Amino acid sequence: MSPFLTEDFLLDTEFARRLYHDYAEEQPIFDYHCHLPPEQIAENYRFKNLYDIWLKGDHYKWRAMRTNGVAECFCTGEASDREKFQAWAETVPHTIGNPLYHWTHLELRRPFGITDTLLSATTAEDIWTRCNRMLAEDSFTARGIMGQMNVKMVGTTDDPIDDLRHHRTIAADSSFTTKVLPSWRPDKAFNIEAALFSDYIVKLGAVADVDITRFADLCQALKVRMDHFAAHGCKVSDHALDVVVYGEADDATLDGILARRLSGGTPGEIEVAQFKTAVLLFLGCEYRRRGWVQQYHIGALRNNNTPMFERLGPDIGFDSINDAPVAQPLSRLLDAQSRNGGLTKTILYCLNPRDNEVLGTMIGNFQGEGMPGKMQFGSGWWFNDQKDGMQRQMTQLAQLGLLSRFVGMLTDSRSFLSYTRHEYFRRILCQMIGRWVAQGEAPADIALLGSMVKNICFDNAKSYFAIEL
C-alpha cells in the first residue's frame, strides 16, 4: 500500500520517478490558456482569505457541493466566506475518486506547504487559519504565487472590446518577469443567435469606430480590434464552438443575415451556420496573416438549468457535455480555411471524449510542412481534466499522431492556485511513459524519453506559440 500524496505520487515505476524528478518537476510553466483576471495581476492583488483565492468563482467546487446537498447560499449566495469554506471542507472527504480530492491537497501542498493535514470538517479551522496567515505575506499575492510556481507565461481570455489597460500596466513593470498576454476571444461577435448579439455589435462598432451595418463592416471592426490586441502582444485566439457548423454564403447573403438580425429578426439554423462559418473563415485568414494560433473548444452544452441561469447567469456550474456531430462540419471548416489563404496553427479540444479519435485523426489531415505539430489535439479539457481523461487524450494522441510534439498542459482556470494542475499532468505523463518502459513498449533510454518529457512540459509550447520570454 502506498501512502497518499507523497513526493512520488502517481509515479509507480522507477523510470517514471526518474522522468518526473529529473526532467519534469523543475520545468517552468507556460500557461497559454487561462481565465485569470488580468486586473488582479496588474494590481498584485492580495487575497482577503482562503475563500477569496480558492472557492470564489470555482464552479468545479460548486458542482460538488451541490451534489453533496449543500444549499446554494454556501456556494454563490449570501453566507460568509468562512461559512462557505466550512461547507467546502465538509464536502471534500466525499470527493474521493473525483479529481477535486487530488487537486485540493496538491494545492494545499503547493504553495501553502501543508502536507500533514487532509481537509475535512474537523481540520477546516486549522487550515483556514494557517493559510490566511500565509496569504498576508508578499509571496502569496497574485504575482507572488505566480513567482513561487515558476510561471513564465500566462495567456488570459479577453473580449475584442476590452481596452487591455491591465495588460499595459503589467507589461510596463519590469520588476515582474512573467509574461502576461491577452488572448482574443470573439465569441460575442460570432454567436449571432445570442439574445444580446445586436447590443454587442453596437459596442464593438463604437470601440472600433466602425458603423457596422454590413458583413464587411463587422470584419473591419474585428480587424481594428485585432490590431489593438496585436499591439499588446496577442498571438493566440480562442473560440467556444459548442456546436460545430458549416454553411457557405456570398457577401449579399451575409449582409442580409446581419441586417435582419440587427433589425430584431431571428436567424434560422442555416443562416446561423452561414454567418458563423463566414466569421471563422475571415478570422482564420487574419490569424494566418498575423501568425496567431487559433484554439477551438468543441462540445459544451451550456446553461442547462434555466431557473439557475436566470438567477445567477452563466459559468456557475450548470454546463455539461454535448453530443452534437463534429467530424463533417469540422472537416469542411478546416478544409475551407486551407483553401481560403491557408490554415493557421490550430489546437482542437473536445469536451466529449467520444470525439477524441475524431480530433486525433482530424489533425493529421492538415499538418504543415516545416512546422512540427502545426495541428494539435489539445489536452483533456474541463470534464476531461482528470487522470483518466488526460491518459485517454495522450494515449490516443500517441496512437494517432506524435505525442512528442504535444504542447502540453494548460490550466484553463480562474484560480491562482490551479498551477498544480501542471504538476498533476506531468506526473500522469511520466507515469504513462514509465509504464510503457516497464512493459517493454518503449526503450529504457532516459535521455530520449527525458528530452521528450521536457519538451511536452514546456519547450514545445514555447516554440509553438513563438512568444519571447
Swiss-Prot record:
EC number of this enzyme: 5.3.1.12
Annotated coiled-coil segments of the chain: none
GO molecular function, one term: glucuronate isomerase activity
Keywords on record: Isomerase
Gene from which this protein is expressed: uxaC
InterPro entries, sorted: Metal_Hydrolase, Uronate_isomerase
EC class of the enzyme, as a word: isomerase
Catalysed reaction, written as an equation: D-glucuronate = D-fructuronate; aldehydo-D-galacturonate = keto-D-tagaturonate
Name of the protein in its database record: Uronate isomerase
SS bond list: none
Tagged with keyword Lyase: no
NCBIfam families named among the record's database cross-references: PRK02925.1 (NF002794)
Family according to the record: Belongs to the metallo-dependent hydrolases superfamily. Uronate isomerase family.
Pathway linked to the protein: Carbohydrate metabolism; pentose and glucuronate interconversion
Organism: Edwardsiella ictaluri (strain 93-146)
UniProt-listed GO biological process terms: D-galacturonate catabolic process; D-glucuronate catabolic process
